[in-house]
Amino acid sequence: MANISYKHFTLGVEEEYMVLDPKTCELKSHDQKIVQEGQKIIKDKVKAEMHQAVVEVGTDICADVDEAFIDVATLRKTISSIAEDLDLWVGASGTHPFSHWESQMITEHVRYNEIVNELQEAARSNLIFGLHVHVGMETREMAIHIANSARYFLPHIYALSTNSPFWEGRKTGYKSFRTKVFDKFPRTGIPDFFESIEAYDNYVKLLIKTNRIDNAKKIWWDLRVHPFFNTVEFRVCDIPMTVQETITIAALFQAICAKLYKLRTQNLNFIIYPRNLVNENKWRASRYGIEGSMIDFGKESEVNTRVLIYELLDFVSDVVPHLGSQHYISHVHKILEQGTGADRQLKVYEETGSLPSVVKHIHENFLAGL
């Protein structure tokens, strides 16, 4: 059997941060001051988002997980330092625990104006913070096949990322309420199966032809073949509280892609499960995080979510050494033992009864371990 090259499984990581008022712990519309100052240092690696209380950063194309860690850590430290100079805080959580979207300003930009004009309150209320991970692909044809199979694992990784238990001052009962907010948008959630890249491209062409979208970036699925880069883009996760959690999740997505690629080169295929079944597990991940159970479709039974995540680690264990990501993958055990960002937010609230204390905890952990 020919040796498999893993070099094309590059990584790109995008994070969305909340901008905070240190005095009130509320979200703070900052008129893009952080972005303007950031672009003097890190150029286009920092960008404005639709709401002024959001800052988006993105890494370079990283050859491996070590590079991604260094890049994300540098971005977090840079943005945090700029914010501090402006008497602001930054933090990483899928939703803000108590700020209301109505009081936040929209960034003046043609693209955002178009989205708000079309989607109205669904867009204005979309005050959420996510993590996007790009994994490099050999070809677009391979990308669509890997995306089809990788859909099954989205709930597992989503459960590890859950970090948004509060919304507008209330405990939602969910470990991740962020996706419940985002579901108001069209073209979100688990994507359909596409038998080929041509089938996907034809779908995009139809939407453009019928004036639904102007380009494929307005397809906001939990996973998509990126319209401009040769990557599979994973978009399901909440922004994790810490850098270590972000890179652990990125390493898992990379390992899943590498394993599915390895199977395909051996003329083996992972089972393609229907979207409606994967959605069942996604809802469970949103509601319970790692504390609940998911459906094992093969056994047709409920299985503890932690057990399924351990099975995922076994599934990718043969490719992880080739990717050099063992250290980061091993952090999954710590998350499973100590809880996700949502679990930690809820613990602080139970101990203090104070949502501002939760925000302070989020801010204090933004640079944890760096």
Over which residues does each language-model region extend?
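C-terminal accessory/tail domains of diverse enzymes
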Residues: 1-86, 115, 182-370
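Acidic, His- and aromatic-enriched active-site or binding-groove loops in soluble protein domains
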Residues: 109-130
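An exposed, glycine/acidic-rich loop-and-rim segment of catalytic or binding clefts
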Residues: 139, 147-194
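Internal, well-ordered domain-core segments that constitute the primary functional module
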Residues: 124-150
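Short, glycine/charge-rich beta-strand/loop segments that flank catalytic centers
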Residues: 87-104, 168-172
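Short, low-order "capping/linker" segments at domain edges
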Residues: 102-113, 173-186, 282
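Short, flexible active-site-proximal loops enriched in glycine and acidic residues
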Residues: 45-50, 83-96, 121-128
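An acidic- and aromatic-residue-enriched active-site/binding cleft used to recognize and process polar
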Residues: 22, 88, 93-98, 131, ...
